Amino acid sequence: MVLVDSSIWIEAFRRQGDVHVKLALKGLLDEYEAAWCSVVKLEVLSGARKEERKALTTRFSIIPFLPVTEADYDWSVDAAWKLRERGHVVKSTDLLIAAVAQRADIRVYAQDKHFEIMRDVLGIGLYQPGYNGMYNPGTE
């Protein structure tokens, strides 16, 4: 299972979006390995065009959902402190997404550089697609 960040969903749904991202997301969806959480849903759906909203809501309804818990908020606060001590400031929403993935022991697929910082400082796992976007079951 891979928690797909909003940066990937948004890029994949752009008309001129990166074809590699589109293929990689398709690979995760085809293998039933894509997951989402409420933070991702908020980020994606709040920026969706009116004509896309129903299709996106339907798509999210059939993908595995990982809830955000109080423990995820606590983890995010601790993570923010660790990052700040090393000179990094990361958005609260990205911290929550990382917390959900960390608790579920799964990787995050993101284009956002903050996740690379969190990988380096906090040890979160990041997903790297396989050849031509095929699902890569291995670790980072």
Regions found by a protein language model. Give the residues of each.
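Generic structural signal for small/hydrophobic residues in well-ordered secondary structure
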Residues: 5-6, 44, 76, 101
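General small-molecule cofactor/ligand-binding pocket signal
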Residues: 35, 66, 127
